[in-house]
Design a protein with these regions (language model features):
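ATP-binding/phosphotransfer module of carbohydrate and carboxylate kinases, centering on a glycine-rich
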Residues: 5-147
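Short cysteine-rich clusters marking metal-coordination/redox-active sites
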Residues: 1
Length: 147
């Protein structure tokens, strides 16, 4: 993580963290369909890992599901605290679809209060990684035109 701290969610489940984990595991001898790419010294990106998961690569599936569970624990805390109507999952990992959402929902169900969790809806963002930039642009537009 760019903050320099250890153990924050960014160091555990970001695309970059998952990319580093898979490279470490490949170096240690774990089998994956991404080994050839690694052996050619080509960078492995999160989109490669998601594609590998869709092609039934066990290691890629495992890493994405692990990330989903960790995010789910954090989301459970937020649900318990803020009781949101909807949780929207975005970013690179949103492209993993059910590979990220099923373990995320499972962990959220396990670690949140049922009274609060039962009415919470989950959605995958259809926006790209530029969602933050779009949000800032909309805020500025609204401020300029006085909304």
């Amino acid at each position: 993580c760019t903050c320099g701290k250890k153990g924050c969610l960014e160091t555990e489940v970001s695309g970059m963290a998952i990319e580093e984990k898979i490279c470490d595991l490949i170096r240690s001898g774990v089998n994956t369909i991404l080994r050839e790419k690694y052996d050619r010294n080509e960078p492995i990106h999160i989109n490669d890992i998601i594609t590998a998961a869709r092609n039934d690569d066990n290691l890629s599936i495992e890493l994405i599901e692990e990330a989903g569970e960790k995010v789910g624990k954090a989301v459970a805390f937020l649900i318990n605290t803020f009781n949101p109507e909807t949780v929207i999952v975005g970013g690179n990992l949103a492209a993993a679809g059910d590979y990220i959402m099923l373990p995320l929902k499972s962990a959220t169900n396990k670690y949140s209060l049922n009274l609060v969790y039962k009415d919470t809806k989950f959605r995958l963002s259809k926006m790209s990684d530029n969602a933050n930039a779009w949000g800032v642009a909309m805020l500025m537009r609204n401020r300029i035109i006085g909304l």
